[in-house]
């Protein structure tokens, strides 16, 4: 099993969710994140004072997948979140040794 994690622009969440739903993903976790990559941040002037905004708002999307589904899900997330501009985000996968559905006690792929 794989845990696919994406840190992407907040405005891309709906496109990602729709793409994953169309692929057949039944669940995902979304949380707020802040950070920067190559684009760093920006300077904003508010009421005459300069402010450095160096941690930009992002979202973190996590999906558990079978090994067979992982590459396809990765492709769906990339296609749904790509704008071609700096700040589009990152996507990575990690091996998961065990998953358990708390309600039923199902383990492994059955818990996904």
Locations of regions flagged by a protein language model:
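Positively charged, small/polar-rich N-terminal and surface patches that mediate targeting and assembly
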Residues: 1-112
């Amino acid at each position: 099993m794989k845990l696919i994690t994406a840190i992407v622009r907040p405005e891309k969440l709906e496109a990602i969710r729709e793409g994953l739903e169309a692929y057949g993903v039944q669940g995902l976790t979304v949380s707020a994140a802040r950070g920067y990559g190559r684009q760093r941040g920006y300077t904003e002037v508010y009421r005459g004072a300069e402010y450095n905004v160096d941690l930009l708002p992002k979202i973190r999307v996590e999906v558990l997948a079978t090994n067979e589904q992982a590459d396809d899900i990765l492709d769906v997330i990339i296609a749904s979140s790509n704008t071609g501009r700096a700040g589009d985000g990152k996507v990575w996968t990690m091996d998961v040794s065990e998953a358990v559905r708390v309600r039923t006690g199902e383990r492994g792929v059955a818990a996904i």
